[in-house]
Amino acid sequence: TRTDSSAASDVYKRQPLEDCVLMAMGKFNKIIEIDYENRCVVTQPCVTNLAITHAVQDKGFYYAPDPSSQIACSIGGNVAENSGGVHSLKYGATTNNLLGIEVVLMDGTITRFGGKAMDAEGYDFLGLMTGSEGLLGVITEVTVKILKSPEVVKAALIGFPTIEDAGNCVAEIIAKGCIPAGCEIMDKALTKATNDYSKACLLYTSPSPRDQVV
């Protein structure tokens, strides 16, 4: 039985065949609560990743994990796959930004793991469910933390002669205590394809207080 919240195939493109159940969760698409005081959002599983940021950005907040498919992927699917993105370097993947879930277990029991605070008491069943690809239960509600948007974001594009040099540079930056908000590496072929298509690319962003940005 596959019960991913998005009722879709995963990144490996496996498809349901015989003796399985495919659950369409598309109508679970509402944001239930935005709690700015506790900096969290309670949402149904088929709200898209990017929709969470859109819902809170007017108040100066955002949801950090950003898979490349964030415009379409569901938050329930993110939990099922423990999704991450460019900004996972600093802010972690879904598991680092997930506070709680409501889930229907295989025997029909409806239960909650976690809540509105990190490190809820008891066993880490929330961690067990995260990344389980929908095999342990059906997620019906998700609570995630939101972060205050940085005052200023600056981007840098840096060229290196080799992939090794690029990796060493990132390691040295982090070793000096400066963790980029996001970082991507592109080889020669990908850089050429990007430039041919868009004439521009973004590799590095770093959020900082306004008075610390050059």
Give residue spans per PLM region.
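Single conserved hydrophobic/aromatic residue that forms the stacking wall/gate
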Residues: 1-8, 12, 204-214
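Glycine-rich N-terminal segment of FAD-binding domains in flavoprotein oxidoreductases
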Residues: 6-28
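Residue-level "edge-of-site" marker
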Residues: 9, 68-69, 186, 211
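Short Asp/Glu-rich motifs
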Residues: 13, 75-76, 192-193
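FAD-binding subdomain of flavoenzyme oxidoreductases
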Residues: 29-184
